[in-house]
Amino acid sequence: MLKVEMLSTGDEVLHGQIVDTNAAWLADFFFHQGLPLSRRNTVGDNLDDLVTILRERSQHADVLIVNGGLGPTSDDLSALAAATAKGEGLVLHEAWLKEMERYFHERGRVMAPSNRKQAELPASAEFINNPVGTACGFAVQLNRCLMFFTPGVPSEFKVMVEHEILPRLRERFSLPQLPVCLRLTTFGRSESDLAQSLDTLQLPPGVTMGYRSSMPIIELKLTGPASEQQAMEKLWLDVKRVAGQSVIFEGTEGLPAQISRELQNRQFSLTLSEQFTGGLLALQLSRAGAPLLACEVVPSQEETLAQTAHWITERRANHFAGLALAVSGFENEHLNFALATPDGTFALRVRFSTTRYSLAIRQEVCAMMALNMLRRWLNGQDIASEHGWIEVIESMTLSV
């Protein structure tokens, strides 16, 4: 099996000053191309350290993706490190220099002399185009390893990997079949509870069950070879049965996107009134393109469940909205949710049974509870659902 590794560079990445989202994206993207990473390393802006690790990994990896260090400043050392590791010099890539000059000219700017550095590549390098920036990439062969050097800007990195590097890998290597990966996301049950229920299922050969907890949700992932797809799809029915009503969506699209599509398909507009969630619902749904009308965030105030229910009923009527959703303020570990619909208004009062979670986590959980309440109504289900440490203590229905 092809041994693929990644090397992230830069002091800011090494010291945790920025999150290495490029590494997470590449690992996930390559995994779904049948190229799971076998190792990831991070090195700072030190020429000796870079040369050392390039030479070291060249003895072990078949492919190494090097990210960062292709900019115009003195701490951008990747091209020099690659040339030094190979024992050769840097040469000016005249065509890329002209392309950079054109890039700046079209934007009404004069290219700084320091940018010339970005056109200096190791003598034996294969040029890799960057259609969205000034840092071209390049590839070199060092010992057994084919190394690709890529820019650190995420948008440039992703374009280069998808459109330049992956096609080269497909040309040069015999890649395995793409793995089958089935995913669903749950809300309301703990990871240990789900695992205990699912561990009794018999997995086909080469198939693994994975769990990813990211408060307030848990993702279940069944991964295996394409040869086992039929058996996996049969097993997946059992996984969904065991997970039960905690399943909120399948795939990777996300709940806000699925709710948005359902609202559009059914021609429902939605108005929101948020207190404790502070605009999280509006943010998540607007990013997904949901048909939102007037949305408000108001200061927290103590309300009875009846007050919340009547208020959101009036708001739906006043804004001529198809649906209206409210999250009340948080008082004494209690919170109200209310959803006004053409069928009536449905309201829940919940109680938090623990105080150990941060404000941000509590807000995320409550936003998900509100979205799940909306999802369940759209699917014709009872709107009440509980979370492991949130208990529904009162419910109310107002008739149309």
Curated annotation (Swiss-Prot):
**Into which family does the record put it?**
Belongs to the CinA family.
Stretches of the chain forming a coiled coil according to its record: none
Source organism of the structure? Escherichia coli (strain SE11)
Name listed for the protein in its UniProt record: CinA-like protein
Known Pfam families for this protein? MoCF_biosynth
